[in-house]
């Protein structure tokens, strides 16, 4: 009889029990590390019994395929993370040994979202949360639209921290996903026409949002879709990331047997205190970026604990306590060259800066619109 419903046949069940009995016998005699699983199902079985640390060690490596590419995963901790599914209590955390790709965290965002159709006419705005010498400088600007912005459309006015906003055109779009400009207009200083009061942060208009929960990179990490179908806006101000048409989701083409043992992990990430009100967000994902605390870099804000340091980083650090300095153990490479890699932690005093590890292992930050390296992590659960 065929095994069409995916249940274990008697023979397969016996094989699995034999394998587990071998593991248990080896562990009982202190030789657990000498017997290695031969499948991801074996690995998951050990994790669920709380025996993974008896067979593996922090720093051991496991591999899977993503298409024709072999992904090398470092084991960075055991039972550090909390499975999102409460029926499970154990976890084994993996992180890619090298930077996988370079991905924009978030694109520069829209200034205004049209809850209802915005008729053609003259409007004025006073962008805030910016810089005295650039966008969001406290001045009021006006512009005239010859064409209506439809309901669900956006007004986009990008700029810079150190440049006169008048150097930048204003553009309108029919939706957050549209890349077709309805019209382009020139702003001037002034208070003519109707005031638009519900505006995005000036920092995010120029450089993107540092909110990880709403980020484009988080969506990419947890997508298995083909290029062009990965990104969907998380907020009304979102704009398409630079990679929207040319990157398949991180899970696309990945081994099915590997994905089957990766469970969703509950993660806490602090929010900035400029636009997001401080505090934290909770996410439940298969794949995630590490926080500064998890990388043995201390807390962004003392009131939010973004997980716990993984032994891979705390036990083999160049330092004996959490630090933000150069640390060779934190450096990630791509084709032999050290790279900058995104964290999920924001720089809490800004709405656009995201924390990253630089090429020497130091803590740093930069704008969300940059494309830095990603070294995703996940948990066998």
Give short role names for the model-derived ranges.
Residues 21-381:
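Collagenous Gly-X-Y triple-helix signature in extracellular proteins
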